Amino acid sequence: MSNAKKFGVFLVVLLCAACMFVFIYTLVKLSLQEGESSSRLTQAVVNQIGEAAFDEELDANQIHALNLFLRTMAHFVLFSILSFGMCTIAFLVFAHPAGRFFGLVLNMLICAALAYGTEYFKQFVDGRHFQIEDAWLNIYGVIIGLCSFLIADLIFWAIRARSSSQSE
């Protein structure tokens, strides 16, 4: 690999890593905010979605259901994005298959620790509490992110193999 290509890969890895650190910081910051702030933020988002999706005012049951759905999906989606991004970094850093496998295992351990840790430390924040269900949602998000990355990589590999066989 030429020096220019190595430098390009280094820049991509650096950019991806910086984006992931900003994402992790935001995730932890949102996760560890006080209960009242978290409730206000979620309520504001629920009201905006309710106004945009429905023409009439939402009743208490609809607001509660939408609030629960948003909080559940937030756990799941945020950790899916985190896992997908960290898998991308692992595949850029490790070139050989054994190294990539190590990178994926390391990714799973780091993401699972973040998934459980963000929930665990909520019990030390005013107005927040630990819920094992939320920790499991986070971990399911990590698994879905990993699976999504592997499927995307498999599709990319198949397209690349097909295009190289057609060019011969």
Question: In which residue ranges do the predicted regions lie?
Answer:
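Short, charged juxtamembrane terminal tails flanking transmembrane helices
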Residues: 160-168
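Alpha-helical transmembrane segments of multi-pass membrane proteins
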Residues: 22-27, 111-118
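Internal alpha-helical transmembrane segments of multi-pass membrane proteins
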Residues: 95-112
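Interfacial helix-loop-helix junctions of multi-pass membrane proteins
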Residues: 115-143
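"…centered on the first transmembrane helix and the immediately adjacent amphipathic helix/loop
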Residues: 2-87
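Membrane-interfacial alpha-helical segments at the cytosolic side of multi-pass membrane proteins
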Residues: 77-94, 140-156
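Alpha-helical hydrophobic membrane-insertion segments
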Residues: 4-18, 102-105, 147, 151-159
